[in-house]
Structures are given as structure tokens and as C-alpha cells.
Amino acid sequence: MRTSQYLLSTLKETPADAEVISHQLMLRAGMIRKLASGLYTWLPTGVRVLKKVENIVREEMNNAGAIEVSMPVVQPADLWQESGRWEQYGPELLRFVDRGERPFVLGPTHEEVITDLIRNELSSYKQLPLNFYQIQTKFRDEVRPRFGVMRSREFLMKDAYSFHTSQESLQETYDAMYAAYSKIFSRMGLDFRAVQADTGSIGGSASHEFQVLAQSGEDDVVFSDTSDYAANIELAEAIAPKEPRAAATQEMTLVDTPNAKTIAELVEQFNLPIEKTVKTLLVKAVEGSSFPLVALLVRGDHELNEVKAEKLPQVASPLTFATEEEIRAVVNAGPGSLGPVNMPIPVVIDRTVAAMSDFAAGANIDGKHYFGINWDRDVATPEIADIRNVVAGDPSPDGQGTLLIKRGIEVGHIFQLGTKYSEALKASVQGEDGRNQILTMGCYGIGVTRVVAAAIEQNYDERGIVWPDAIAPFQVAILPMNMHKSFRVQELAEKLYSELRAQGIEVLLDDRKERPGVMFADMELIGIPHTIVLGDRNLDNDDIEYKYRRNGEKQLIKTGDIVEYLVKQIKG
């Protein structure tokens, strides 16, 4: 490709609305342009990267035995009503009616569509197992699209769905998809972790996320410093303290705390160790309960894990925090003065709180706290559960080492769905015993557009993108200095361009009438891994300057050796 016949579209300045580095660099490198909130046009450079990612995904899915299909973006509403997700999905599901007043949705995912297909196409257990995938556009009407293509409304996704007559068969495909995903992200040159995860709104019994480690990530990824244990923070178990609860050394005292409405204010004003404080959060109880609210207690320096809390049988789903008005109607005190003593509603405490003694908490009286609270002396020990987020330094749940926490960007997710959708849509086949058998399902997703952004978040420097070789838009950039004034430079540039292309190497020849500084800046911004610079001065010595983008190292290579050298660098 020649720049004179290509839409380069690089920008010198960073657009003001681009927050994360991937969004900034994708705009500056001429990969994308914003059309509307959460909607982007992909320019030629972006499409080249996107296709590289797609091809790797497609190759590994095919290698794992999956079969490619293509399903409509537009889906009839009755399928979503049949599965029960019409109400569950909420406003992210874009709903509309056609000219015949028939309701439809823009598909954010395709469980319903593929299950409908299978229930009409398969009849016997002999046709299974099968695993279908597609690489196709999805739409989710995000309330706050942000971070460019990282959280856009329209995006490209690889989604796969497998069908089985046994859990053993599902596990085999699940393991194959786990291995395929690991190969996909390894081939792309990404630093990632596969972590245990919550199944969320899609449902199911088992789940793993594939997280690319990056400071800008929205998720906390938890892993052991000595073992293979890894989990999303939503799922990571917080182990109960091994040490027995210390004996009480203080009497419980009612203390006036009119200006301490938060744990931070309480700690600062009364010089308390934060580890000796407890915060109380009130959430709505499950429908039909004899109490409207449930009190959840965690240590002052810990955070409530909302996913764990929502799974408590007495807590309403989705988890909903009580308003001040609702709290006062039950406790007759404000949110900053709540605690376990004389709490008139059910209480659930975290494992760490259960091990505390001589602690401080609200007195359920405005402007007052109890200091020196002890379980079983001042208040009966209530129900104990794991309801907090783990923190760095906690023991690993597998008993090996301690936990580390890093930020991650979720780029892939695999689920064992079980029979959730096949039961709802009555997808069954004739089993080996001749009776109808409901199918067991798995689903496996990769955010193709998100992978591109995640790769940049992990691979950049002050000059621009530093692409892993496997997904770079071009492999080699040829920069001929003053080629329009030097016949020798022009002739060699054309010769090398032809020879490299003949070797199957993707080349960008910068044949613009631009200053060298502009040419260098653009190629580094775009992130092409290998650059060769042709100039009269070096050619006097039969030399060509070679530069590797990742480490910035330069070296002179003889003109006659440069093609062989590049082929070796790229193809090994």
C-alpha cells in the first residue's frame, strides 16, 4: 500500500473528549472516527487491525471444531419474551416496531436466536455435540458509552453456542473453548489472565473471563502470587480470619458523634483504627419477606461485594440500597448512625466482622455510636457470610500464597449455561433411550473491537501505538527520504516495495511529499513494527537504516541483505 493511495488520517492533537489512551491513539492514528455517542466508523488502518484480530479468532475457533454461521442483528421480540429476558434485560435492549407494528430488538447477544434455530433443525442425540459461532455486529444501548470502542453501543463480537446431551459433553467443549481462547490471546501477544467469574444476567453454572491486564481496566482481577488461582473480584472468596476472636477488653459505651457520619470522619475525629470500625449498609429484602430491609455489615476498611450480597436468599435481586426515607421508617436513624445493636431487621455480617472484638459501630440513634462492642456479650452473633471484596494480601482461597490485585479489561467470557435457554424455548432432541431430552448449552464470547482497544492499552509509548506483530496494520514501513528529488532513493524504494510484497509481507510505502519528521511521527504513531529508512547519505555506503518500533533500536543493514533480514524478523 502507498500512502498516496491510502487514507492515513493521522491527527497531531489529542481530541478533548478522549479519556483513555486507546481512544486517544485510535483517533490520532486514524483508526476510527466518532459518528454519534457510542458509534464509530472504522477507517482503513483500524479495519486492517480488526481483520487481523478476526482472522486469528476464526482460525482458532475452526481449529477447535466450531462451525461458523451468521444470524440476524434484528430479532423478533417474541423470542426474548419466551426466554424471559424481555423484562430482565432492561433499557440496554433496544426495542422497536416495524411498519406492521410487530416488535423487534437489536440483538445484544444471540442465545435466543441460536436456540430457536437448533430446536427446529436438530432431532436426535446422534447429531450432537455441535458448537456454532459467528463474528457479527451487536448493539447495546449503553447509558453512558465511554472509552471509545472499549464501551461503545455498537460493536463487533465473536459469539459461540454449543449444544449437548450431557454435562460431560459440555465440559469437554468448555475446556476446548478455554484452550482456544488462551491460544487466541497468546497469538495476539497480549498479557492476559483467565479468571473465575460470576455468570451475571446470561445465567448458568460456571464461567471464566479472559482479562487483559491494563491500568485503565474497569475490572479488578485477583490472582495468587504462588499458584494458578485467578478470579474476578466479584467472585473471589474472602477467607475467614484464622486467628480466633480476641477477648473483650472494653465495655460498650454510647458516644456522641454528631459530626461523624462516615467511617472516615469517625476514624479521624476519635483517633480510631479503621480496622476497629464496622459499617452498616441497608438493602431491600426479597419480595414476600416479613421485613422490608436487610442490614449488611463489613469492616470499615472493606467494601461490600454487591454480587455476593445479591446471592443471599433474604436479599432482593437486583441489589437495591435503601433510601434514607426507607431507613428511617425502619430504624428511626440516618445512614451514618447504623449498627448491629438493637437493629430491628435481619442482620448478615461478613466473616471478618464476625472475628472482631471491641469495635465501633452506629447506635441506631442519630449522632451516636457505640464503642467497645463485642459479639455474644452486647449483641448476639447474627448470620455470617462472605459479603466483602477481597483485598491485596488476603490469603488465596486455594490455600496457596496471598492475593494480588490488578486492573483488567474483559475481552472474552465463557459460560456453562446449562438448560436455562433450552428449557425456556423447549429445545430438545430424542435421547439415546428414545425419550425427549432438553439440551445443555454453553456460550463463548470475544469482544473483537474491544480486543483492539485492549491491545493498545497494553502496547504504547509516548510516540504512539506499539503493536504486537500479529495484529499490526502493516508489518513494514518504507520511508524514502526526498524520493521525489532522488532517483536512486525512489528506484530502491520501489524495488524493495515489490520484493517485500512478493514475500507476502504487508508494506506501507510513504511516498508523500512530506518532511522526514512528519513521516517518522506518523509511522511511530500508527505503530508499524518494522521501519526502513532510505536516504542518499546511507546509500553512499550501500546501507539502509532499520528500526524496530518496540525497542527503538536502529541499525544499518546492507542494501542487498535487507529483504532477507526483514523476512527473517517477521516470519522467523
Curated annotation (Swiss-Prot):
Reactions that this protein is recorded to catalyse: tRNA(Pro) + L-proline + ATP = L-prolyl-tRNA(Pro) + AMP + diphosphate
Gene3D superfamilies on file: Anticodon-binding domain, Bira Bifunctional Protein, Domain 2, YbaK/aminoacyl-tRNA synthetase-associated domain
GO terms classed as biological process: prolyl-tRNA aminoacylation
GO molecular function, one term: aminoacyl-tRNA deacylase activity
Superkingdom in the source lineage: Bacteria
GO cellular component: cytosol
Subunit structure as annotated in this protein's UniProt entry: Homodimer.
Protein name: Proline--tRNA ligase
Species of the source: Escherichia coli (strain 55989 / EAEC)
